[in-house]
Amino acid sequence: MIVNLTEDGSSKKMKFHPNHYLVMKLKSHLISQYAIYRNLDDNTIRRKIKLCDEFINVFSKIDSGDSTDWWAITMYEKIRAEMVLDQRILDSGGISMKEFLDNVRKSIEVWKKIMTILSIEPEGSYLRKIASQTKQEISKAQDLLLMAQFF
């Protein structure tokens, strides 16, 4: 990966291995920065999902398992991005309602795991706030599934 080292766009560039610590740190920051979905186009959301996958793939080699806080936070970001993208694809006719609802059901299962992992964090901490937001996401998704039964 080539990383531009200056903000002014000059040509001072260095090559890093895609799994280098600094590259992974950059990916982590990009994942966080791609948070306001209404401002993002579909390709940027896809990029965020890809960054999440890359981050999980590399860090799972260092700190294996899917019960770690870094896994939970990254999966939270990934699932939210996937849901936004799925909604847009559904709206444009790219997937069926059945496929969309299947994806919602899968997301709920992952969100439940995320909430379990992060709910043990100290009250008032950033991770505990994400657990609370995850609970809200689960509730919204379950409401969506209930409403879909009437259509």
PLM regions and their residue ranges:
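Extended alpha-helical scaffold/coiled-coil
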Residues: 1-151
